[in-house]
Amino acid sequence: LINPARISEMMQLFKSNLKIPVDFHTHCTPGYGLGAVLSAIVHGVDIVDTNIWNFAGGPAAPAIELIYIFCKKLGIELDVNMEAVAKINKELYTIRKELEAYDAVKQFPNPFNPLTDTLPANIDKLFDDAIAAAKSNNEEALLEACHAIEAYFNFPKPNELVKKAEVPGGMYTNMVAQLKQLNSMDILEDAMKLIP
């Protein structure tokens, strides 16, 4: 869990001191994911990890479809077949529905295909605002724009408990699943406070 300001500094250090490709992986749970990935891209990352739309956001990595829009606006070519991604996304929707009993989030993003759907002007501008904020290292404006983008598409809101405890997405969703099995969700907030 890394905020955009920190990844901006780290990318500059990595790129000036390492001779190997840099791969950035994060989760969206605390609200940093999309902004941190954009910051990493703007500051020269070689590879970013993403998820396909219906499995993205929340405790997962940012959606490749959103990263595709950012990269297109930045003139960065992705070596990804987005038509195949759209087909896979349809299958993943069905799979996620089948696994609903195990889904910690139970919130699906609004349907969207960046190859066929047109963004409203105000949402398209949010992508431009986020890019400008990432380039100028304005973390507050970057997170504001990214959170507005995620809200428009109905991705989960940042989880303040996770943000404060700095718990990775997978650890958080596993803990929630275990507490649900024990009928002990009432202790989640206290449990999160105990995590160093």
Report each predicted region and the residues it spans.
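Catalytic cores and adjacent flexible loops of soluble metabolic enzymes
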Residues: L1-P196
